[in-house]
């Protein structure tokens, strides 16, 4: 009971959520460039982009969620499936709204999988076992289903909760594709196929340590503000918000009731420890220059190196997302009896920089060149160009700033 009270009264500073959201914001600040090739005019594609999972999420929103949860868990699995239909033609399928859709599974729902090396040396997913949970209304038992995929068939079973979880076969259908329509999306590749490495695993441990120290602070504040009253059992008294500690009757009769109150000097040490852990989290996430809420002593070189590391981290994540999305679109086209010949291009450079620091440097260069003997216009032109690069949001705006269109009156 006491542990539950401490959990309920302790705030949680969710650094994992903050960092995952920051990564997501940088990765999808500019939308990926998607060339769908031969399937770009298919009506199924337009419907899929507007509602990827048949629950209203657009494809961009779906991929953002995929990136968020792969950042947390290390990997997720995206399944591209198509509902069963008795339609005989493609026109009938379109009329019924039958098309491929996407579904995301986090690691706790991926029960088993197997990769096998083909004759060409490529590893191929040959078996997959997934757990699906169907939430029911209040007062009704939740239903659990198991879906198993092989290259030849797809099996669906219901978990019998009355018989120690024994699966009850429900249906078995032929796998029309001849392969398993699933793609593992990694945050970072690990040594084992199908298991990724989380971006925030160490950060989560540090955040838990911070939460424990916040709990200690809360307890110290509570005990300091509400001291305990020490009395014998016969004394009839109350201690307000504080506790009452009863002494045995055998104690010295000369003892009078007194207050027991701990010192609060250790709170400052705990707060300093929390601050040090937050700085460590920023270093681990390469965000010391982005998440700091106070001025920290960092040289210009250290700041630039921090941004380079963050840019490299985001670039690696972008490559993994691009590779996964290309594989997903191949499965989508295969469900429609086509071959994906398009191209997916995620941004690989994120141009993370401290504009204030860069402007200070350019200002010093301009002032120095102005006082130098024999200063030429070329130096000033370079400074002006760099200032335009800082002010422009993208390459198109930079081009317009460097090549302004003059009006007829100005010509």
Per-region residue spans from a language model:
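Extended, helix-rich architectural segments
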Residues: 1-105, 409-411
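Alpha-helix boundary/N-cap detector
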Residues: 3-18, 22, 36, 40-43, ...
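Short secondary-structure junctions and interdomain/linker hinges
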Residues: 26, 34, 55-63, 69-77, ...
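Short amphipathic alpha-helical segments
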Residues: 44, 54-58, 62, 70, ...
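Extended, regular secondary-structure scaffolds
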Residues: 67-190
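Residues in well-ordered beta-strands of folded domains
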Residues: 79, 129-131, 246, 345-347, ...
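Extended, charged amphipathic alpha-helical segments
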Residues: 165-305
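C-terminal helix-loop subdomains that flank or include functional centers
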Residues: 250, 269, 276-411
């Amino acid at each position: 009971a006491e542990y539950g009270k401490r959990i309920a009264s302790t705030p949680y500073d969710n650094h994992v959520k903050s960092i995952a959201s920051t990564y997501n914001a940088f990765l999808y600040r500019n939308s990926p460039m998607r060339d769908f090739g031969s399937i770009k005019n298919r009506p199924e594609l337009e419907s899929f982009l507007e509602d990827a999972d048949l629950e209203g999420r657009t494809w961009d929103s779906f991929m953002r969620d995929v990136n968020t949860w792969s950042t947390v868990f290390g990997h997720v699995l995206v399944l591209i499936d198509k509902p069963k239909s008795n339609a005989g033609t493609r026109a009938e399928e379109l009329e019924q709204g039958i098309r491929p859709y996407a579904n995301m599974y986090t690691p706790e729902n991926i029960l088993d999988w197997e990769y096998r090396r083909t004759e060409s040396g490529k590893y191929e997913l040959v078996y997959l076992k997934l757990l699906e949970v169907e939430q029911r209304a209040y007062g009704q038992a939740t239903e659990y289903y198991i879906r198993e995929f092989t290259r030849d068939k797809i099996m669906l079973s219901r978990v019998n909760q009355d018989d120690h979880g024994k699966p009850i076969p429900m249906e078995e259908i032929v796998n029309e594709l001849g392969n398993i329509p699933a793609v593992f999306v990694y945050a970072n590749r690990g040594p084992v196929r199908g298991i990724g490495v989380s971006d925030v695993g160490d950060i989560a441990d540090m955040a838990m340590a911070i939460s424990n120290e916040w709990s200690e602070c809360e307890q110290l504040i509570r005990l300091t503000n509400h001291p305990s009253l020490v009395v014998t059992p016969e004394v009839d008294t109350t201690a307000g918000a504080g506790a009452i500690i009863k002494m045995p009757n055998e104690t010295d009769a000369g003892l009078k009731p007194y207050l027991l109150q701990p010192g609060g000097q250790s709170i400052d040490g705990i707060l300093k420890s929390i601050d040090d852990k937050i700085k460590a989290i920023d270093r681990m996430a390469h965000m010391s220059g982005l998440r700091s809420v106070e001025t920290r002593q960092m040289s210009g070189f250290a700041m630039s190196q921090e941004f380079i590391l963050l840019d490299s981290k985001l670039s690696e994540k972008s490559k993994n997302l691009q590779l996964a999305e290309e594989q997903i679109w191949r499965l989508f086209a295969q469900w429609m009896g086509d071959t994906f010949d398009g191209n997916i291009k995620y941004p690989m450079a994120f141009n993370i920089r401290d504009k204030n620091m860069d402007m200070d440097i350019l200002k010093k260069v301009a002032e120095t060149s102005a006082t130098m003997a024999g200063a030429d216009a070329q130096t000033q032109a370079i400074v002006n160009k760099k200032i335009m690069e800082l002010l422009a949001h993208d390459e198109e705006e930079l081009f317009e700033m460097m090549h302004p269109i003059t009006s007829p009156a100005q010509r």
